Amino acid sequence: IEVPKGGAEGMLLTSGGRFAGYGFYLLAGKPVFLWNLIDLNRIRWAGPDALAPGRHSIEFDFEYDGLGVGTLLFNNMSGLGRPGTGTLKVDGKAVQTIPMPKTLPMILQWDESFDIGSDTLTGVNDADYRPPFALTAKLNKLTIKVDRPQLSPADIKRLQTAMQEKAKAD
């Protein structure tokens, strides 16, 4: 992003809103990533300082500690809702890392939107901003990379065995 003189604020990217989802935004010039867990809990990563005028790279990286959706192929939900660790980075340097003891086992934002540069429906955190919360910085590039966990051959064998044992028991 490119922050103008006088600072910037606003939504970079959001998916979801008041009842579930996430937002990546600048608040009083500081980068914030917030994960709204079905309005029961909000986990918030924030940079300690407002971004100075000029070009910056801001990134949110989440490392999931589970097997992921691949377990569903074996009628097993054990890969979903597992913990993970989120890290907020500014110009390549980690500014805050927070572990999440649980994640949502599904996506719950059917009535919300995916927005870039503003938030067009409800906000993920009313305590921080009110929509549309238009971005006042210049967004030069946005990259979204999703690395889904991959089942190992040992994971597959274990899940197949569990599915077969369950079928015998039923």
Feature map (PLM): residue ranges:
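Extracellular glycan-associated modules
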Residues: 1-170
